[in-house]
UniProtKB/Swiss-Prot annotation:
Protein name, entry field: Validamycin A dioxygenase
Comment on pH dependence: Optimum pH is 7.2.
Biological process, per Gene Ontology: antibiotic biosynthetic process
Natural source organism: Streptomyces hygroscopicus subsp. limoneus
One Pfam family in the UniProt entry: DIOX_N
Gene null: resulting phenotype: Cells lacking this gene are still able to produce the aminoglycoside antibiotic validamycin A, but not validamycin B.
Membership in a protein family: Belongs to the iron/ascorbate-dependent oxidoreductase family.
Keyword Oxidoreductase in annotation: yes
Length: 365
């Protein structure tokens, strides 16, 4: 236990007897009710693979602008590169219009349903740079581990609430997710910062859970709680920070908190410090209808049922509309998408193409 952010060992949870599991469940439930986060040990992601993923991702940002630009995000439902602009996969609070001081490279699952319009919205093609073949190879291995861990965490969270282990994962069999490599440049790189400007402004994430592998820094992550205000969560080498997102807050009908967090601007006391975070945003099946849990398991907030895909797309459009208004996004806000190298041709889509009963298959990308 480190303050209000506990360390939870996944293997210890799995091996615990009824009494010890009840004790662990109380700790996890308390942390998610008050803050919305905990540290995860025993997750089984190889440290060597994590290091390679960080190195491969960081290499992308060293490419010249003209090499990165073809991989830029162009639509709300897109993967690829986002430059030094204010962009998010979260609920935005705003920081006076100053752009966030980071770049990001996003990638997603390789699921395919066979319906081009549906896939373009929910399983868009990845944009792998030809100059960095190791990025694709490493990312596929790393995200396979992160998807495994996300499923294990969702099973554990069901256990914390006294639900069947598959309660959450049964709605996540073909979940949408985004793996982001976030590069936070040094102060020497970005120059003087504007008042109130941050690497990432205060926000909550859109999805169910986020798995964060971060680096320790002078100007790093801060989380918020009503009791403590803003504070830096403990850094423990080899652990992942598990953050709850808006969908899980909704699903538990307010019992658990969607973590409010931010990343501070680079500090004048460490002008050469740059950080790279590996952020895995996990949602649920895009066609899933999330019905808030009834009391006493749910929090009794009276939240409505939501559709996962519609909710995520709506928030992405809201985010990019805000950016476009500030001249920080040059792409399209339409939900139609032309084909890519992976999927030639054009794939127009309606607002929410539905594929009831369809199960996407894993395929190469």
């Amino acid at each position: 236990m480190t303050g209000s952010v506990p360390i939870v060992d996944l293997e210890a949870w799995r091996a615990a007897d009824e009494e010890n599991r009840a004790s662990l469940a109380e700790i996890i439930d308390g942390a998610l009710h008050t803050v919305g986060t905990f540290l995860l040990a025993g997750h089984g992601v190889p440290a060597e693979l994590t290091a390679r993923m960080r190195t491969a991702g960081r290499s992308f940002f060293d490419l010249p602008w003209e090499k990165k630009e073809p991989h830029a995000v162009q639509r709300p439902h897109d993967n690829g590169w986002r430059g030094l602009v204010k962009h998010r996969t979260d609920t935005i609070e705003g920081t006076g219009g100053a752009p966030d001081l980071h770049e990001a490279f996003h990638m997603g699952p390789t699921h395919r349903t066979g319906d081009d319009a549906f896939d373009a919205l929910y399983y868009p093609a990845n944009k792998w740079p030809a100059e960095l073949p190791e990025l694709r190879e490493t990312a596929l291995a790393y995200t396979a581990h992160m998807t495994r861990v996300a499923g294990a965490v969702m099973e554990m969270l069901a256990g914390v609430l006294g639900l069947e282990p598959a309660f959450f994962t049964s709605r996540c069999e073909h979940a949408t997710w985004t793996q982001s490599v976030n590069w936070y440049p040094s102060l020497d790189t970005v120059g003087q910062t504007a008042e109130g400007q941050m690497r990432v402004g205060p926000h909550t994430d859109f999805g169910t859970i986020t798995l964060l592998d971060r680096q320790q820094g002078v100007s790093g992550l801060e989380v918020w709680s009503e009791e403590d205000g803003w504070f830096a969560p403990p850094f423990v080498e080899g652990t992942l920070l598990v953050n709850l997102g808006d969908l899980m807050h909704q699903w538990t009908d307010g019992r658990w908190r969607s973590l409010r967090h931010r990343v501070l601007a680079p500090s004048a006391s460490a002008p050469q410090e740059e950080l790279v975070s590996l952020v895995y945003f996990f949602d649920a099946d895009p066609e899933a209808e999330l019905v808030p849990l009834a009391a006493p398991v749910g929090g009794g907030a009276g939240m409505p049922t939501v559709n996962v895909g519609e909710t995520i797309l709506k928030k992405n459009i809201q985010m990019l509309t805000d950016l476009k208004g500030h001249g920080l996004f040059q792409g399209e806000l339409s939900l139609s998408r032309p084909g890519s190298a992976d999927s030639p041709g054009s794939s127009p889509a309606d607002d929410h193409p539905s594929r009831p009963g369809r199960h996407p298959a894993q395929g190469p990308q």
